[in-house]
Amino acid sequence: MRKKKDGQNLPDFRKNPPKLDKKAYEKELKRLQAELVDLQQWVVETGARVVIVMEGRDAAGKGSAIKRITQYLNPRSARIEALPTPNSREKGQWYFQRYIEKLPTAGEIVIFDRSWYNRAGVERVMGFCTSQEYRRFLHQAPIFERLLVEDGIHLRKYWFSVSDEEQIERFEDRLSDPLRRWKLSPMDLQSITRWEDYSRAKDEMFIHTDIPSAPWYTVESEDKKRSRINVISHLLSTIPYEKIDRPLPEIPHRPDSESDYVRPPRDEFRYVPDVAAHLEEERIKKEEKAKKAKKPAKAAGKNSDKQKSSGGKGKKKSKK
């Protein structure tokens, strides 16, 4: 328990935080997303470069956090990179080469949904790289990142942490949801039986790559809503951006046409079918059906009232 200045005990939410209230979450998320728009405007105007690395356990909430970060950003200057398995040509290159090609130019934000740290995680655990390649990566990654930072890139690295119990629950949710089942890969399922191997790989990765110029920040992600608020808030607090006030553009008045242009007849165009009209038709039918169902109920209620009143009058007469 924590204490207020007046000595009153308060629950300590840092160890076992409760689920975030939905309304409070949505309100704060909108505020932070508005700030992200300001951040992007500053990046574009100043020519800054931002790289955000999102790593963590499978189903830890990286993807949903990225979705909220980019929801209102201009995709022309903010993009997500989720590189597939390297092809034969990429396997013959320097390991970092294919990631260098995806780095931002001036005025861009790039979010890596998994990154060069695949080598320290899945490749290490599943045996997709040799021990020599793995050790070389741990040596070169800090050097590579120092070069990025020295060149002026704002580099942020986040590790989304989730418990094994919560991960299983999320896997089960994905399995039961046809719309999200594609997110459950064979590699995800194998990670269940290799939990401790991944834990050791993560610990080793932190030891070698958590450097002052590019530190790791852990995001507690048992509650996805809480993790989204926390990671966005941290990102905004660590980049020294300023809100750039730009004059609002004026929407011009469309002048009256002075030409003899006449739009071609509607039937000359090919339109997609208006299947949405069926939704409105169904709504109207349901409303009419509900009205018809109410009428007999009202009639039955009136008859019942009449019977009660007539029964009451009869009783009074018998008393006389």
UniProtKB/Swiss-Prot annotation:
Signal peptide positions are none
Please identify the protein, giving its name as recorded. Answer: Putative GDP-polyphosphate phosphotransferase PKK2A
Entry GO MF terms: polyphosphate kinase activity
Report if keyword Kinase is assigned.
yes
Q: Which InterPro entries match?
A: P-loop_NTPase, Polyphosphate_phosphotransfera, PPK2-related, PPK2_PA0141
Q: Which GO terms describe its biological process?
A: phosphorus metabolic process
Question: Which reaction is catalysed here?
Answer: [phosphate](n) + GTP = [phosphate](n+1) + GDP
| Mutant phenotype after disruption | Deletion of the gene does not affect significantly the cellular polyP content.
Q: Where is the composition biased (Basic and acidic residues)?
A: 12-21, 281-290
Q: Which domain of life is it from?
A: Bacteria
Q: Which UniProt keywords apply?
A: Kinase, Transferase
Q: Which organism is it from?
A: Corynebacterium glutamicum (strain ATCC 13032 / DSM 20300 / JCM 1318 / BCRC 11384 / CCUG 27702 / LMG 3730 / NBRC 12168 / NCIMB 10025 / NRRL B-2784 / 534)
Q: Which Pfam families match?
A: PPK2
What does the similarity note say? Belongs to the polyphosphate kinase 2 (PPK2) family. Class I subfamily.
Q: What class of enzyme is it?
A: transferase
